[in-house]
Amino acid sequence: MNKKTNLIWIDLEMTGLIPEKDVIIEIATIVTNVQLHIIAQGPSLVIHQNDEILSNMDQWNTEHHTSSGLLRRVRESSLSCKQAEAQTLEFLKKYVHTGASPMCGNTICQDRRFLYNYMPTLERFFHYRHIDVSTLKELVIRWKPNAKMIFEKDSAHLALSDIQDSIDELKHYRNVFINV
């Protein structure tokens, strides 16, 4: 295991897309090596939010987080955002040096915006760079629109399954598009 080169994959579920008004309701992480083999799966943590905050979610988030069961789990959780941040950092420090890993995932800049607002210590744990799988997807759509290179996934909109999908998606693009 190389704590200098391992990659941290992260996904957040939020009440919406605007970090100034919406909040994190779930966080999960997975650590892989550079060949994208999973080394360790971090805790998948559901963060308590009060009913006032949850009632301000838009229709899309309300429907998806209700159908996945996440909204019920948020109400039942007693975990604070700070506690989730501390538990996530405790896990990550076992596998990756501070500042070594880019933030990996899909549309990861959005997650980083929320981490900056709500989990700043965790946000600073990452390198400033990203490995954003959605960039490759957008390039394939634009450069090879008729090819069967686009990775199809059936997301549950739960943080841990979304990370696993992102890792599989990057493996797919590495094999069929990048040819490394």
UniProtKB/Swiss-Prot annotation:
The active site is at Y128. Pfam families: RNase_T. GO terms for molecular function: 3'-5'-RNA exonuclease activity; nucleic acid binding. The keyword Transcription regulation does not apply. Residues 7-170 form the Exonuclease domain. It is found in: Cytoplasm. Its EC number is 3.1.15.-. Keywords: Cytoplasm, Exonuclease, Hydrolase, Nuclease. SUPFAM superfamilies: Ribonuclease H-like. One of its GO terms (biological process) is DNA metabolic process. GO terms for cellular component: cytoplasm. It is an enzyme of class 3 (hydrolase). Belongs to the oligoribonuclease family. 3'-to-5' exoribonuclease specific for small oligoribonucleotides. This is Oligoribonuclease. It comes from Ruthia magnifica subsp. Calyptogena magnifica.
